[in-house]
């Protein structure tokens, strides 16, 4: 699968992901970019799950952002509604982590839109390892959001066989 981690600290929000794509238990590609900028670079998003499914969801989410003038929560709720109720979309298997200057969210195909505590998100097969690492670093260091995300991905990559050490990182700055 993959690992996507999002950390928010001191006026910065980061979403970072590894680059491994697998087919069954075979690595097919090691440099997939699973994190990207959307809506005029005001939103960052990462995916865990099927690559083709995720690209479809990125496109749909960007349309929802445009429809709601960049309002992240409204766009996320509308995407989750469509994802849950549309027969074709329901078959898509992926999770999205999205963030802007005000919120960090997880969007699922079950219709869930979750804003996690401490604005810390970790999804995918390496998510539990990345979340534990990031939480420890948030609580015990003064590292930046970017440094925490990188270290959390490194730790997940050392433990999870579906996560590698090729990282794509996107960062937004805002007034804290």
Swiss-Prot record:
What family is it from?
Belongs to the peptidase T1B family. HslV subfamily.
Classification from the root reads:
Bacteria, Pseudomonadati, Pseudomonadota, Gammaproteobacteria, Enterobacterales
Q: Tell me, what is one Gene Ontology molecular-function annotation carried by this entry?
A: threonine-type endopeptidase activity
Induction per UniProt is:
By heat shock.
Q: What is this protein called?
A: ATP-dependent protease subunit HslV
Hydrolase as UniProt keyword: yes
Q: How is the subunit organization of this protein annotated in UniProt? A: A double ring-shaped homohexamer of HslV is capped on each side by a ring-shaped HslU homohexamer. The assembly of the HslU/HslV complex is dependent on binding of ATP.
In which organism is this protein found? Escherichia coli O1:K1 / APEC
Q: Which gene encodes it?
A: hslV
Q: What does this protein do?
A: Protease subunit of a proteasome-like degradation complex believed to be a general protein degrading machinery.
